[in-house]
Amino acid sequence: MHDRISSLGEKKLISRIISRARSVFGSSEVMGLGDDAALIDAGEEFLVLTSDLLLETRHFPDPERPRDMGWKTVTVNMSDLAAMGSRPEGFILSVALPDLELEFFDSLMDGVIEACCHYQAPLIGGDTNEADEIILSGTAIGRAEKDMVLMKSGARPGDLVAVTGPLGVGAAGTELILSGRDTGGFENAVERSLRPVARIEEGLILAESGLVSSATDITDGLVSELGELMDASGTGMRIYEDRLPLGREVPEIASILGRDPLELALYYGEDFELVFTAPPTGMEELSDMMELHVIGEVTVGGGIEMVDKDGVTYKLHVRGYEHLSPG
């Protein structure tokens, strides 16, 4: 019996691809491979490129809002640029579509163009094809100063760990929409789910400060992304439950849905915030420049630990949103 890709899951499959690429191409040709975006030497700067693929049936909790679908397609790509401290320069969109009504298609494209304008990244090309469902593939292009680019590697024991904003809001909004319940009173959570905003400005502040040792975005879940920083840096992580900035509506929505609010904040994903590390003195300087929430520290090793509200320490299993998984 032959193994299938579901036996690996998305992250191990990506590692398999990276390993095969590195066996052929030199390290100077595959800079950024395995990070949030690829880096191409462009003289005094890096050209930063990233690509994300979204499916109608998997990535959009309300496919009856085409403008929001277009917006989100751009934003998920821009979030990877933000994680690298890159300034957007352009966006390429490839689409595979069923025979949509033109009004629906125009609304979808209005969302794409609106987002491109928001991020100051003009739509510069793409491709079209046919499919049984809506498939949207975006490629974002940016630039970053060579000595300022943010990477997943570089965290050191003693560094502090911080996030740029509240956790669990997008997850709570997504689950509320999928439940079919009344979303009245939870407009912010719904907006965070359907029209997230990439933290481009925050990424630029972090990059230009020169104070950050590692960074990534947390669209696939906080614990999963902490695992990425940990593995890339060869360290461990310790976070504190009472320091996690849960969005104010997360506990109430979780109660309505019978969900654990901590689970939504730690594992679900859909939070378009950044998580980063910096030495204590650097983190203090950064706190004067932008909103941030210190949630823990980098440790010598031993995986990811959580200290709960009673002071009890336990290990967290590194998981989060992942495609190509069994079940």
Curated annotation (Swiss-Prot):
Mg(2+) 5 binds at residue 220. SUPFAM superfamilies: PurM C-terminal domain-like, PurM N-terminal domain-like. Mg(2+) 2 binds at residues 52, 80. Keywords: ATP-binding, Kinase, Magnesium, Metal-binding, Nucleotide-binding, Thiamine biosynthesis, Transferase. Pfam families: AIRS, AIRS_C. Substrate binds at residues 59, 270, 321. Mg(2+) 3 binds at residues 36, 80, 217. It catalyses: thiamine phosphate + ATP = thiamine diphosphate + ADP. GO terms for molecular function: ATP binding; magnesium ion binding; thiamine-phosphate kinase activity. InterPro entries: PurM-like_C_dom (IPR010918), PurM-like_C_sf (IPR036676), PurM-like_N (IPR016188), PurM-like_N_sf (IPR036921), ThiL-like (IPR006283). Mg(2+) 1 binds at residues 51-52, 127. CDD domains: ThiL. The keyword Lipid metabolism does not apply. Mg(2+) 4 binds at residues 36, 50, 80. The keyword Nucleotide-binding applies. Pathway: Cofactor biosynthesis; thiamine diphosphate biosynthesis; thiamine diphosphate from thiamine phosphate: step 1/1. Its EC number is 2.7.4.16. GO terms for biological process: thiamine biosynthetic process; thiamine diphosphate biosynthetic process. It comes from the Archaea. ATP binds at residues 126-127, 152, 219. Belongs to the thiamine-monophosphate kinase family. Catalyzes the ATP-dependent phosphorylation of thiamine-monophosphate (TMP) to form thiamine-pyrophosphate (TPP), the active form of vitamin B1. Reaction mechanism of ThiL seems to utilize a direct, inline transfer of the gamma-phosphate of ATP to TMP rather than a phosphorylated enzyme intermediate. This is Thiamine-monophosphate kinase.
